[in-house]
Structures are given as C-alpha cells and as structure tokens.
A protein has these predicted regions:
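RNase H-like, Mg2+-dependent phosphodiesterase core
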Residues: 1-137
Length: 137
C-alpha cells in the first residue's frame, strides 16, 4: 500500500460513441495516468494496446490481470469505481434495473429499453442499442 499509487480515468458515452470503445479506453487510461500524484517508474497495462503517452515507461501484458497482482488489483479498483457509478445512475434512472444488471445488456435491460427507450447514458453505437429506434434522449 505504501508504494502504491492509483487513479481512475473515465471516458464519456459521447466520447465512446465518437471514437469507439477501444480508443475511449485508451483515453481513459491516459487520463488516469495523468491524474497520478506521482509519476511511476513504470506502468503495466492489461491487454495488447497502450495509450499514446510520451515520457512514460508503459508495457502492455496480454491477460495481465491473470498474471500480475498489481494489474489484478487495478482491475478490481476499476470495477468497483464503475459499479459505484452505475449504482448512482440506477438511482437517477428508474426502470432500467441498473442496480441489478450494472449496465450490461441483459434480457431484462433490453426489455426495459424496448419499453421506455434509451437515454443519454446508453451508447448509441453499441450493437443491441443501435438497433432500437432512438428516443427519450
């Protein structure tokens, strides 16, 4: 814990729809790295892509969350942050059952979208969503 530093970076739904999920993930990583209070000697990233950042020692590790404890920990931090965000959305956006499905495209969630439509928190470029008539935005 003493030698650990972390931050969470985010990308908006509009950014994801505009630049795609991969580029938005890289943008969120970049934001998280830039928010760190101290520049780390190296940064390990789960996957095969790294954000475009000069003057940082970045290394992508495929399946890194299964191989490296610090990457596993980062995955948990990211999941907890996302779940907290989704829980907040669920309280403000009744009807989508986000408190149960956490924003994943479950049958229940898709049924709710068919009934009440999508809102500004839905990614319009996500395949199941893009098939629905867009309203309630």
């Amino acid at each position: 814990k003493k030698n650990s530093i972390w931050s969470v970076g985010k990308a908006s739904v509009k950014e994801i729809d505009k630049i795609n999920i991969l580029q938005a993930s890289l943008l969120a990583m970049k934001r998280a790295i830039k928010k760190l209070k101290k520049k780390p000697s190296h940064i390990l990233i789960d996957g095969n892509k790294i954000p475009d950042l000069k003057n940082y020692n970045l290394k992508a590790i495929i399946k890194g969350d299964q191989k490296i404890a610090s990457i596993s920990a980062a995955s948990i931090v990211a999941k907890v942050a996302r779940d907290k965000f989704i829980t907040t959305l669920a309280k403000k956006n009744i009807g989508y059952s986000w408190d149960q499905n956490f924003g994943y495209g479950t049958k229940q969630h898709l049924k709710a979208i068919k009934k009440i439509g999508i809102n500004k928190h839905h990614r319009k470029t996500f395949s199941p969503i893009s098939k629905f008539k867009i309203h309630n935005i």
